């Protein structure tokens, strides 16, 4: 059975666990006498082999407040690990990423609160998530979560960060707890029609998102608020096709051969000079993508697709047009002859005539007719960056080929 094959690949071995424990031993020594806990998928037993990010939360009394976490707590943590390979990262507040033996450990300052619904910062709920999941999943359930995570990774809908807008690890765990197993999740997801409500607890507010899973530890929060409709639809379609024809391709998509360039494709390579929060950068990138598409359409280009991918330092924006060539002049359609606005139209336009349909027309010159210039002008990044741009001829870049292909490998 395919799921058993996949599980053999993704389930950590005892050797893997020992390797993680050795790394944690180093961290435990550094955080000695602090109130800290290992959280996340490693603690819950739902982590995937070779996906070895570990979450360690250092808790401080809730009375010290959020500002204390950003300054005092962070400095305390840095002083304890400063001789190790570490970098600063940014979410709601800064935290530290330590790299030991190619294992990333996120050390996150948080506030110790009485319950999940009393959280002051988003991460304060984490220990309650851990307790909820570990008390509702047995060993088989943890394997079912692993299968669901790998399936979602394979089809590109895993990850709650703004760049992906997909399912979080916690969301996959709740789906398994609610439906019972991997296959059952797919059976139900294949029939989804939004809005979809999955209630492990009664919600404490009205949610408007397409997929609603009230958080069992804080019912005022929707666990899947960040999941885009595109990713919900992709997951539902993938579930339907997997149940019809199970294949390892859903879990581990193959790389396809070179895809033909259709239309004209502009590639914009952005290299960011400054470090910033991933969600902040990707919020600006997504706004840029939308702005580029709107502007090109406004100037008369027929846009096929605009997408972006990359990390927080190197980002690619791909713009696919039916054609990059567009006339310097265009037909401007005016009002009907009996309209009260014809005088205004005549005053503002040249080369005016009355059409056979009784409507006024004119010829106007486009303010801008170079697609590359328009695209560059509509990038709205607030950090400094360098940009390289070119029109695609051919490529061996897997991400660009994926962009050109459009169709996921599991679909066809």
Curated annotation (Swiss-Prot):
Keyword Membrane listed: no
Keywords associated with the record: ATP-binding, Magnesium, Metal-binding, Nucleotide-binding, Nucleotidyltransferase, RNA repair, RNA-binding, Transferase, tRNA processing
Needed cofactors: Mg(2+)
EC number: 2.7.7.72
Organism: Saccharolobus solfataricus (strain ATCC 35092 / DSM 1617 / JCM 11322 / P2)
SUPFAM superfamilies on file: Nucleotidyltransferase (SSF81301), PAP/Archaeal CCA-adding enzyme, C-terminal domain (SSF55003), PAP/OAS1 substrate-binding domain (SSF81631)
Positions bound to ATP: 41, 44, 129, 149, 158
Official protein name in the record: CCA-adding enzyme
Lineage: Archaea, Thermoproteota, Thermoprotei, Sulfolobales, Sulfolobaceae
